Amino acid sequence: MINFSLLTSIVLLASKVVGVSPSYNGLGLTPQMGWNNWNTFACNVSEDLLLSTVDRIAALGLRDIGYHYVILDDCWSDGRDSDGMLVPDSTKFPNGMKHVADYLHGKDFLFGMYSSAGEYTCAGYAGSLDHEEDDAAFFAKNEVDYLKYDNCYNRGQFGTPETSFNRYRAMSEALNKTERPIFYSLCNWGQDLTFYWGSGIANSWRISGDITAEFDRPDSRCPCDGDEYDCPYAGFHCSIMNILNKAAPMGQNAGVGGWNDLDCLEVGVGNLTDDEEKAHFSMWAIVKSAMVIGADVRNLKPSSFSIYSQASVLAINQDPAGAPAIRVWRRYVPETDQHGQGEVQLWSGPLDNGDRVVALLNGGAKERPMVAYLEDIFIDSFVGSEELSSTWNVYDLWANRIDDSTASQILVGNRTANGLLYNATQLSYADGLKANDTRLFGEKVGTIEPYGLLNVTVPAHGVGLFRLRRESRK
């Protein structure tokens, strides 16, 4: 049944944000990459944690591969002073936030901070509702480059798209007023159809409740399943597949300057298998989600480090076209896992240079052969089209992954990442793709003939991820 009241609110809201957005800031031309402390450390934050993490990210080559934002989440403040200005916790941050920003900037990182569009933050600290201009000035004064803006204790100011839009627009306008470029990342859990209005005021927006390090485990704390993209109660402890399925219809509302954020990466967090971590990283990359590390980078295992440093996958995420892949089909399979879950999916999306990304995702409990036909990969093409009548070379985007032995040597300091990992600081992903840098294209593993198919074997809870390149005609 169509909710005409809700539809009317959306139409009215859209009419207000058509054209040049007042919050457009020139940021977010590709999805943000970085690190956030929450998934591993929660409220256990400090100056030492941030600075030691920065040093580690740089030493491992992860900064140069693209992880530039270091984002301090909740629990950093000690309330407000007599003038109503935010005060950092002097025990956790004895030198203040400007000192942290200076250190990060000196190491060629960007500094992110956190607040909430509510009376309090989610952990009960001072929120920014009705303090937007003062708090934006605080962030600008401390040379913050990124704001994650949460949704807790919002005084009931939600329920329609326009209500939530107005609450989040207040901080957007306050940030712009400072004239400092600050990436604005909404964290309202997809409430009130954020994907319809987020791009008018922000650079990214969360689409669901908080992620947990589970591949496809139902949890009553994340009450909406993956078919409910407009979830009235987002909750938390949402699995990877739950969030991915919620994201499936939303790609049409994201692009250059404004991205769907599927939450931080759980690679290296919890007990996901290697195939699950690869699938998680791959799917976040192709839907053009934020790629924000949620693990303790000071204690990464080799396999997780090699996933975070896989440039051929990151090149899909950072592709200048900014076109999220779409889910072409989704089918349930009888081989369910211990949680009763089992499905397979095909995803496909265009890339800037005419290539195509293809993902065959196996959410079932057993390894299985999977097939993708060209007419499904190019779902919008017609019989006789150039796409269907061409020959395509198939490149495996995980084939050139660094091995655990090499990753271990880098992690213990016996080998440098320089010259081994891709350096997007020296050569951007856009320029590397133009230059046909082989590190960004994977390894050729086959060919699809005109009107043909891709046939691969995909492990349980795993993915086959490929770049298709049109074969040159003689």
UniProtKB/Swiss-Prot annotation:
<comment type="similarity">
    <text>Belongs to the glycosyl hydrolase 27 family.</text>
</comment>
<dbReference type="InterPro" id="IPR000111">
    <property type="entry name" value="Glyco_hydro_27/36_CS"/>
</dbReference>
<feature type="disulfide bond">
    <location>
        <begin position="122"/>
        <end position="152"/>
    </location>
</feature>
<dbReference type="Pfam" id="PF17801">
    <property type="entry name" value="Melibiase_C"/>
</dbReference>
<feature type="binding site">
    <location>
        <position position="74"/>
    </location>
    <ligand>
        <name>substrate</name>
    </ligand>
</feature>
<feature type="glycosylation site" description="N-linked (GlcNAc...) asparagine">
    <location>
        <position position="423"/>
    </location>
</feature>
<dbReference type="InterPro" id="IPR013785">
    <property type="entry name" value="Aldolase_TIM"/>
</dbReference>
<feature type="signal peptide">
    <location>
        <begin position="1"/>
        <end position="22"/>
    </location>
</feature>
<feature type="binding site">
    <location>
        <position position="73"/>
    </location>
    <ligand>
        <name>substrate</name>
    </ligand>
</feature>
<dbReference type="InterPro" id="IPR013780">
    <property type="entry name" value="Glyco_hydro_b"/>
</dbReference>
<feature type="disulfide bond">
    <location>
        <begin position="222"/>
        <end position="238"/>
    </location>
</feature>
<feature type="disulfide bond">
    <location>
        <begin position="43"/>
        <end position="75"/>
    </location>
</feature>
<dbReference type="InterPro" id="IPR006215">
    <property type="entry name" value="Glyco_hydro_melibiase"/>
</dbReference>
<keyword id="KW-0964">Secreted</keyword>
<feature type="disulfide bond">
    <location>
        <begin position="224"/>
        <end position="231"/>
    </location>
</feature>
<feature type="glycosylation site" description="N-linked (GlcNAc...) asparagine">
    <location>
        <position position="436"/>
    </location>
</feature>
<feature type="glycosylation site" description="N-linked (GlcNAc...) asparagine">
    <location>
        <position position="44"/>
    </location>
</feature>
<keyword id="KW-0325">Glycoprotein</keyword>
<keyword id="KW-0732">Signal</keyword>
<feature type="binding site">
    <location>
        <position position="252"/>
    </location>
    <ligand>
        <name>substrate</name>
    </ligand>
</feature>
<protein>
    <recommendedName>
        <fullName>Alpha-galactosidase</fullName>
        <ecNumber>3.2.1.22</ecNumber>
    </recommendedName>
</protein>
<dbReference type="InterPro" id="IPR041233">
    <property type="entry name" value="Melibiase_C"/>
</dbReference>
<feature type="glycosylation site" description="N-linked (GlcNAc...) asparagine">
    <location>
        <position position="414"/>
    </location>
</feature>
<dbReference type="InterPro" id="IPR017853">
    <property type="entry name" value="Glycoside_hydrolase_SF"/>
</dbReference>
<dbReference type="GO" id="GO:0005995">
    <property type="term" value="P:melibiose catabolic process"/>
</dbReference>
<dbReference type="InterPro" id="IPR002241">
    <property type="entry name" value="Glyco_hydro_27"/>
</dbReference>
<feature type="glycosylation site" description="N-linked (GlcNAc...) asparagine">
    <location>
        <position position="455"/>
    </location>
</feature>
<feature type="glycosylation site" description="N-linked (GlcNAc...) asparagine">
    <location>
        <position position="271"/>
    </location>
</feature>
<feature type="active site" description="Nucleophile">
    <location>
        <position position="150"/>
    </location>
</feature>
<feature type="glycosylation site" description="N-linked (GlcNAc...) asparagine">
    <location>
        <position position="176"/>
    </location>
</feature>
<keyword id="KW-0326">Glycosidase</keyword>
<dbReference type="Pfam" id="PF16499">
    <property type="entry name" value="Melibiase_2"/>
</dbReference>
<feature type="active site" description="Proton donor">
    <location>
        <position position="210"/>
    </location>
</feature>
<keyword id="KW-1015">Disulfide bond</keyword>
<dbReference type="GO" id="GO:0004557">
    <property type="term" value="F:alpha-galactosidase activity"/>
</dbReference>
<dbReference type="GO" id="GO:0005576">
    <property type="term" value="C:extracellular region"/>
</dbReference>
<feature type="binding site">
    <location>
        <position position="148"/>
    </location>
    <ligand>
        <name>substrate</name>
    </ligand>
</feature>
<keyword id="KW-0378">Hydrolase</keyword>
<comment type="subunit">
    <text>Homotetramer.</text>
</comment>
<feature type="binding site">
    <location>
        <position position="206"/>
    </location>
    <ligand>
        <name>substrate</name>
    </ligand>
</feature>
